From Swiss-Prot:
Stated name of the protein: Signal recognition particle 19 kDa protein
One Pfam family matching this protein: SRP19
Primary role: Involved in targeting and insertion of nascent membrane proteins into the cytoplasmic membrane. Binds directly to 7S RNA and mediates binding of the 54 kDa subunit of the SRP.
Statement: the UniProt record of this protein carries the keyword RNA-binding: yes
Location(s) in or outside the cell: Cytoplasm
Gene it is expressed from: srp19
Superkingdom of origin organism: Archaea
Organismal lineage: Archaea, Thermoproteota, Thermoprotei, Desulfurococcales, Desulfurococcaceae
Entry keyword annotation includes Translocase: no
Gene Ontology CC terms, in alphabetical order: signal recognition particle
Amino acid sequence: MVFLREKEGPSGGSGRRIILWPAYFDSTLPRRLGRRVPRDMGVPSPKPEDVAEAARRAGFEAVVEESSYPRLWWRVRRRIVVLAPEDVSKTDIIKAVATELRKIAAARRKRS
């Protein structure tokens, strides 16, 4: 739940940096381990690249960085840094990304 306010975002644009962790969208995790969306809005074990792609489809700039999620520190994971306008809340961003992530997961299931 870390967000930093900076003048420069991931690609040099202005806005607010929002940190998104794949655990926010993982339907296999309980909320106490970091899931931030309802189970039916999540996907099982989302990949950081898919979360970043979902953020881009939702209209945000996104960059994947190496880091470990504090609640699951023993797992080496990556985080997604999203550049967001000041007037958009983190909750709204998470919901928008979750919606796009479900579409990506559904398309992947259809291809398999």
